């Protein structure tokens, strides 16, 4: 699918997650469809396993649940979520044929190979393989003056920058990711409260 950033009716599926480390066994994954004029016209929710290897399928499930043919790009809050549950960008792009971009906001100081091996001795090689396949991050300076680090497939660098700038209003977080993160956090709090009330 060709990405036309200047398209008036462009729609982005922004996906974020929320969990409590050491408490949650599941992480809430929330996806919202946002138009170029920042109106929201769809959302979907699922869960993935904290420390699991099902984040990629979680993203695909969100996309499938929406059953939309008008999504022009998928935007993710990073590729490592829910405590080292690694998203496979290539698999998502190959299965959806929709351009995809993953956004992070800080340089990583972590030695990921070491953490994968220490915490997941049974499948650390798989996690490392997926992570490396995602490639290196690129720095992009936004119109707000903030810099983000991105990985992308199905789009050029100038298209990635144009897409981010179209959906940014302030700071460094694009609106589809800001809103989907708020939704995921609210749902996680609701689930925790419901669990406490049922005890």
Report residues per predicted region.
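Long, charge-dense
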Residues: 88-148
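A structural signal for short, well-ordered beta-strand segments and their strand-loop junctions
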Residues: 14, 75, 101-104
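Charge-patterned, long linear interaction tracts outside catalytic cores
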Residues: 152-199
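A glycine-rich, hydrophobic loop/mini-helix early in the fold
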Residues: 26-82
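Conserved active-site and cofactor/substrate-binding residues in soluble primary-metabolism enzymes
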Residues: 7, 26, 50, 54-58, ...
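Gly/Ser/Thr-rich loops at beta-strand to alpha-helix junctions
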Residues: 18-22, 78-87, 105-110, 155-157
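Two-metal-ion RNase H-like nuclease active-site motif
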Residues: 1-22
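Generic secondary-structure signature for well-ordered alpha-helical cores
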Residues: 20, 64, 121, 136, ...
């Amino acid at each position: 699918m060709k990405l036309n950033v200047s398209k008036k009716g462009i729609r982005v599926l922004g996906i974020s997650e929320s969990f409590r480390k050491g408490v949650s066994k599941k992480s809430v994954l929330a996806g919202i469809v946002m138009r170029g004029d920042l109106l929201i016209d769809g959302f979907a929710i699922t869960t993935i396993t904290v420390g699991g290897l099902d984040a990629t399928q979680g993203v695909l499930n969100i996309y499938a649940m929406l059953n939309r043919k008008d999504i022009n790009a998928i935007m993710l809050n990073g590729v490592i979520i829910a405590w080292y549950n690694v998203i496979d960008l290539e698999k998502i792009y190959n299965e959806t044929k929709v351009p995809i971009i993953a956004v992070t906001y800080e340089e990583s100081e972590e030695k990921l190979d070491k953490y994968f091996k220490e915490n997941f001795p049974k499948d650390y090689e798989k996690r490392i393989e997926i992570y490396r396949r995602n490639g290196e991050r690129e720095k992009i300076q936004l119109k707000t003056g903030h810099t983000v680090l991105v990985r992308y497939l199905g789009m050029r660098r100038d298209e990635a920058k144009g897409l981010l700038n179209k959906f940014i209003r302030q700071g460094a977080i694009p609106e589809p990711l800001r809103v989907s993160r708020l939704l995921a956090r609210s749902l996680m709090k609701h689930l925790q409260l419901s669990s406490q009330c049922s005890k």
